[in-house]
Amino acid sequence: MAIHSSFEALAYQSGFANQFSSEALPGALPMGQNSPQKHPLGLYAEQFSGTAFTVARNEARRTWLYRIKPSAAHPRYQRMDRQITGREQGPINPNRLRWNAFDIPAEPVDFIDGLIALASTSAADQAEGVSVYVYAANTSMQRAFFSADGEWLIVPQQGRLRIITEMGVLDIGPLEIAVLPRGLKFSVQLLDGSARGYLCENHGGVLRLPELGPIGSNGLANPRDFLTPVAWFEERDEPVQLVQKFLGELWTTQLQHSPFDVVGWHGNNVPYTYDLRRFNTIGTVSYDHPDPSIFTVLTSPGAVHGQANIDFVIFPPRWMVAENTFRPPWFHRNLMNEFMGLIDGAYDAKAEGFMPGGSSLHNCMSAHGPDNITAEKAIAADLKPHKIENTMAFMFETGKVLRPSLHALACPQLQADYDACWNGMARTFNKESS
């Protein structure tokens, strides 16, 4: 598969969930209707639906594609011998878990073969929940792929990616994210020698911006900072492998044409990128550490109002100015289930053991919080204003328990001594001080 030129500047459209439109050739988009009897350029009209037809209009996600050959032009899929590592859920385990970063493989591995399933909330046939993966790759994909199981949120930690999609081309690197709609065909090219990162597959309602409430009309992730690609296509009639993920399994078929043959499109079921450095961080200017929900970038609502199917939360560089306050994230037992990763630098609640590329999992009611070293320093700190810099941690927080995979519980990256970071917590209680 030809690789889109690695260094040319890409064009984007700005906004979130807009009714976008783009054409790579004049006349690719029909005027005044979606499905003309005969397209002026001889293209096929194909609707790409990300929601049911009858959802509320403000919830609807769909895009009309105008392509050289319809997606229906393919032979039967066959189950692949090689499947994603870690597909099998492990036994119930209530313990706090933490993993070191996974190494880049020595043998050639592309983005799909480099996926490792760490945890999931439910079987892939459920219309809710999430699955969490890490990836480590050292070669560009020479095939195309789509997931029928959910929307993909890709969080690079190392190495830049060029993602060729049916609707255009987008680039991301560390401190940026990409969201790919369920079912969108794409291919990942490596712009550096290798790449590593995290992936959340959202099986539930599509990701959207959180409500701002009393914050007002601006703040957190601003809509204009989300970028959607412009139409780009290739006209090639040659064999291309197409892989799909269906109910957690990989199946493959052989196309006789490029799947990236969309000459024009319009709609709002689209891929997009976002630069996490543009997040407008909100925090206290008086006392106490606010709830981490103020750091939410994107959310997928759950069945219970206010309880997310998945929240994507970041902990970016920020000023700490709270007075008379224990400033690190406080000790916590949570109804929600927290998977954390570290993109860059250090996390302010963990002095050691949590490195870039690493992960941790604290499920429902697992007690967690700053480690012993961090807590001691915070209690004794001189509370001058200071800025936390060189950091970018994130959290996938879900209302459903994340079951670790068998592989995640057996792999050498799992830290056997994670609980030890809370050993020796000093007894500082002094009833004589009352």
UniProtKB/Swiss-Prot annotation:
Pathway: Amino-acid degradation; L-phenylalanine degradation; acetoacetate and fumarate from L-phenylalanine: step 4/6. Its EC number is 1.13.11.5. GO terms for biological process: L-phenylalanine catabolic process; tyrosine catabolic process. Coiled coil: none annotated. Keywords: Dioxygenase, Iron, Metal-binding, Oxidoreductase, Phenylalanine catabolism, Tyrosine catabolism. GO terms for molecular function: homogentisate 1,2-dioxygenase activity; iron ion binding. The keyword Iron applies. Its cofactor is Fe cation. Disulfide bonds: none annotated. It catalyses: homogentisate + O2 = 4-maleylacetoacetate + H(+). Homogentisate binds at residues 347, 368. One of its GO terms (cellular component) is cytoplasm. The active site is at 289 (proton acceptor). CDD domains: cupin_HGO_N (cd07000). Hexamer; dimer of trimers. Involved in the catabolism of homogentisate (2,5-dihydroxyphenylacetate or 2,5-OH-PhAc), a central intermediate in the degradation of phenylalanine and tyrosine. Catalyzes the oxidative ring cleavage of the aromatic ring of homogentisate to yield maleylacetoacetate. Belongs to the homogentisate dioxygenase family. This is Homogentisate 1,2-dioxygenase. It comes from Pseudomonas syringae pv. tomato (strain ATCC BAA-871 / DC3000). The gene is hmgA.
